[in-house]
Design a protein with these regions (language model features):
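A short glycine-rich, Lys/Arg-flanked "PGG" loop and its adjoining helix->strand segment in the class I
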Residues: 201-213
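Class I SAM-dependent methyltransferase SAM/SAH-binding core
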Residues: 124-126, 130-177
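Conserved class I S-adenosyl-L-methionine
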Residues: 65-118, 132-136, 156, 216-237
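Low-complexity/repetitive intrinsically disordered segments
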Residues: 1-21, 50
């Protein structure tokens, strides 16, 4: 029923941008959940007593535990950023009101092809958070899709975008498992995301998959909170 209602409510924006409709995204998320459950059930059913008899985990048990751990991590990340959404949004609002708005646009655009047409240049902003990149790029006339795993962040992004929100396609997705077709975007941009990811390499593979041949991938990040587990950095901090 949810998928049918979503299908009725969805517009053609997704199709025009080679992006799954609301219902298709919900269906994809459902399939991913079912697949994970199937893996865990199959793994449990296939596990033998041989490993247990020797105090050794079977391969299927390892797969099951890894999948459970990943889902727990995603939930923890979503909870963390849900709590921080409003405060982080205020930081982005300050950036939008200052020189960073222009400085970041210049930084991004210097990497884009000179012969581009902004109106047809398709950009994916992964881990958009409160929407800083998606806002300044939409303001410059680009076709922007903004992705974040945390619903609260997407709500802040829409509020911060104001009138630009109608031009941005917002999607709630896991950055490591994107529901987009291969070679969809001319550029993929991200800021302050990869330090959150358990497996950045998997995320990079996905980002490259949805990037057109010859496209641009721009990732800006740092070792945030490195001082918490690195003695040398702790002294500097």
């Amino acid at each position: 029923a949810i998928m049918i209602a979503a299908k009725a409510a969805s517009n053609t924006a997704g199709a025009n941008h080679d992006i799954m409709s609301v219902s298709e995204r919900e269906q994809t998320k459902f399939v991913h959940r079912e697949r994970r459950m199937a893996i865990m059930i199959a793994a449990k059913a296939a596990s033998s007593t041989e490993g247990a008899n020797h105090g050794i985990m079977s391969v299927s048990d390892i797969v099951m535990r890894r999948d459970e751990k990943y889902m727990e991590l995603l939930e923890q990340i979503e909870d963390y950023w849900t709590d921080r959404a409003e405060g982080y949004s205020q930081v982005n609002q300050e950036e939008l009101a200052g020189d960073n708005r222009t400085n970041w646009r210049r930084e991004l655009e210097r990497h884009f092809p000179e012969n581009r047409t902004n109106e047809t240049y398709k950009i994916l902003d992964i881990g958009t958070g409160p929407g800083f990149f998606s806002i300044i790029l939409t303001e410059a006339g680009y076709q922007v899709t903004a992705v974040d795993y945390t619903e609260a962040m997407l709500e802040e992004a829409k509020k911060n975008a104001g009138a630009f929100a109608q031009k941005i396609t917002y999607c709630q997705m896991d950055a490591s498992h994107l529901a987009f077709a291969d070679e969809t975007f001319d550029a993929v941009v991200s800021r302050n995301l990869t330090w959150n990811l358990e497996d950045p390499e998997q995320a990079y593979k996905e980002w490259m998959r949805v990037l057109k041949k010859g496209g641009i991938l721009l990732n800006y990040d740092a070792n945030w909170y490195h001082h918490l587990f690195d003695a040398e950095k702790r002294e500097e901090y």
